[in-house]
Amino acid sequence: MRQKGHRHGRTVSPCAGCKLLRRKCVKDSCVFAPYFPAKEPYKFAIVHKIFGASNVNKMLQELSENHRSDAVDSMVYEANARIQDPVYGCVGTISSLHRQLETLQTQLAFAQAELIHIRTLHRIHTKPPPYTASTVTFPSNKDFYSDIDMAVAYTDDAGDFLWSC
């Protein structure tokens, strides 16, 4: 149903809200017009079914204009979720995603623990035999320019040499 008014030689159709409610749409003062265009009637229909036109109107009027678009997007999302899951709505989706996140975090923790275990086993199997001071020969003091005598005392668990002076 088109309005009888003309703008630049063409008829102007009402917004989806006014069309569904069968009322005259004055684009300059209609709170629904910027957010529920005529070419997307399903958006207003689903929001109207779940929240009611009066409640949507009140919610939009209470918000500043820069927050209204986000509010409409949220209402459309919540209305779709309520249609798909009449009992839990979007809370059901949030709970499902939360459980999925917890499962993935648990799997990640197990994978990280397994990686540490494999690295530890690899380090143990590729560890060089421990050296003792008696099996290693060092150059004499005359080969050094200092008075410091250093000897390998032992190796640590990571296979790194520890020196003693």
Swiss-Prot record:
It comes from the Eukaryota. Residues 13-115 form the LOB domain. Expressed in young shoots, roots, stems, leaves and flowers. At the bases of lateral organs formed from vegetative, inflorescence, and floral meristems. It is found in: Nucleus. Pfam families: LOB. Induction: By cytokinin. GO terms for molecular function: transcription cis-regulatory region binding. The keyword Cell membrane does not apply. InterPro entries: LOB. Keywords: Nucleus. GO terms for cellular component: nucleus. PANTHER family: LOB DOMAIN-CONTAINING PROTEIN 3, LOB DOMAIN-CONTAINING PROTEIN 4-RELATED. Over-expression of LBD3 induces a dwarf phenotype. Belongs to the LOB domain-containing protein family. This is LOB domain-containing protein 3. The gene is LBD3.
